[in-house]
Swiss-Prot record:
Annotated protein name in UniProt: Small, acid-soluble spore protein H
Domain of life: Bacteria
GO CC terms in record: endospore-forming forespore
Keywords for this protein: Sporulation
GO biological process per UniProt: asexual sporulation; sporulation resulting in formation of a cellular spore
Entry keyword Kinase: no
Swiss-Prot/TrEMBL induction comment: Expressed only in the forespore compartment of sporulating cells.
Family: Belongs to the SspH family.
Localisation per UniProt entry: Spore core
Species this chain originates from: Bacillus licheniformis (strain ATCC 14580 / DSM 13 / JCM 2505 / CCUG 7422 / NBRC 12200 / NCIMB 9375 / NCTC 10341 / NRRL NRS-1264 / Gibson 46)
Listed Pfam families: SspH
Amino acid sequence: MNTQRAQEIVESPDMVDVTYNGRPIYIQRVDEQNETARIFPLGQPENEQEVPLANLKEH
């Protein structure tokens, strides 16, 4: 996923179907400089992680 699209998803009021390693996730924020995103699996906000944007897939 590119940086611009990830940022659009973060700012969108709608829930967008995005996965990381096949698991549905929520994007909290995007680090444009490092091309990473702070995410957590849906329903598991305690499992935050920083991942490369290239590993996120929009469905």
